[in-house]
Amino acid sequence: MAFNFMPKEVKFFDYLNLQAENIVKAADCFKAAVKQGLFDEETVRKIKDFEHEGDTLSHEIVDMLNRTFITPIDREDIYALANTLDDILDMINSMANRIKLYKLNANEDYMVQFADTINQSAQALANAVKHMHDTKRAPRAGPLHRGQRA
């Protein structure tokens, strides 16, 4: 019977990247709905689907953490990042639900600017997570850390 002392490579960065891409999709959907001023049942359901997918990814990441002895970065950092990414999706979902519930006029200028900021932040976050495993590119992951807009 042969033993494999090398741990099976777990793709934490791939799952975190999927979670970040999911945030971008939800932010894109939110931004489009704000620009159209349309938060109907279908739009809110789409955003809820992104949020549900994020919950699933977050649970999978936590399950992998519980089954993995050696992680590429500190396990608490992976856990915190996975939960924070899930929280972002929860907040986008909550905003969409409240806009629909209270029948707010989402096409106001301040809402459009807010949706643009959320979208730009989501894209910068996805870019940072995408390059997180590459330490050479990490300092140049995005312009937001320097206080600039993309």
What residue spans do the PLM features occupy?
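Cytosolic, long alpha-helical scaffolding segments
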Residues: 1-150
